[in-house]
Amino acid sequence: MKPGVLLAEFLGTFFLCFAGIGAILSATSAVGGGGGLVAIALAHGLALSVAVNAFGGVSGAHFNPAVTTGMLATGRISASNAVAYIVSQLLGATAAAQACAMIFPATAVAEANLGIPLPAGWASAGTVIGVEIILTFLLMIAIFGTAVDPRGQAVKIGGFGIGLTVAFDILAGGPVTGASMNPARSFGPALIQGHWDWHGFYWVGPIIGAVLAALVYHHVILEKKPA
């Protein structure tokens, strides 16, 4: 595997996490409190759209350990390459979180806990896992439909469609779980902050959702080429 592939995964994950964390910190009272949930959703969605279009032809534009695991489950990436992808994604997310921690005031970082996706106070463990499964399932279906399935590729909206899915997932699920859908997005700020509460749930839910969606699309929806 060429180094540029892993660099693309690093940079694409950096795009997503820097924009997302930055938007959350910008919405704090310490910075100005503007934007709110809609701005946060748009920041994540637009950044991912650009990153997918920029790097999709290089690495496939996973930028998410759950997506990589779904591709592994359907034989679209080898186990060794999947591990390398995930390490690159975690490094990109951590670099983005560190950059945001250095740029924004410490009061904003503390107020938003560096943008770590966390559940509402009333949400149970089952709610967190269930919502993250649903949100990531929808994201992975969008990825397969626009970037994997040749019938979707012909429409040429892959990055835009995937980014919009992340945006509406955040609008729908953000108030419940923080709408991570991406273990790297959770890992980066958690590592910088040393805050691991609920962290495991943000691996389990997205990975289950992504693998389920990948298997459903691969075995039920995707047209198989005749042998």
Cite the ranges covered by each PLM segment.
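Membrane-interface helix-loop junctions and terminal tails of multi-pass membrane proteins
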Residues: M1-A227
